[in-house]
Amino acid sequence: MPKQKSHSGASKRFRITGSGKVVRQKANRRHLLEHKSSRRTRRLAGVEPLTKADAGRIKRLLAR
């Protein structure tokens, strides 16, 4: 039986925390930040947990 591989696109976008939650980065904070307010860019910092419905699907892609 061949080794099970994780989905490389998903592994670059999602992380699984120690408690088992799946987290992702928020969108819109890569470039063109000049016209975005400081308040908006601060709000977009950090990670966002996925909903339970999506988390199960992503865990399957990450082979967990």
Curated annotation (Swiss-Prot):
- What GO biological process, any one, is recorded here? translation
Enumerate composition-biased segments (Basic residues): 1-15, 23-43
Q: Where is this region: Disordered?
A: 1-64
Tell me any Pfam family this protein matches: Ribosomal_L35p
Got any disulfides in this one, which pairs? none
> Superkingdom of this entry's organism?
Bacteria
Listed name of the protein: Large ribosomal subunit protein bL35
Task: Point out the gene that encodes the protein.
Answer: rpmI
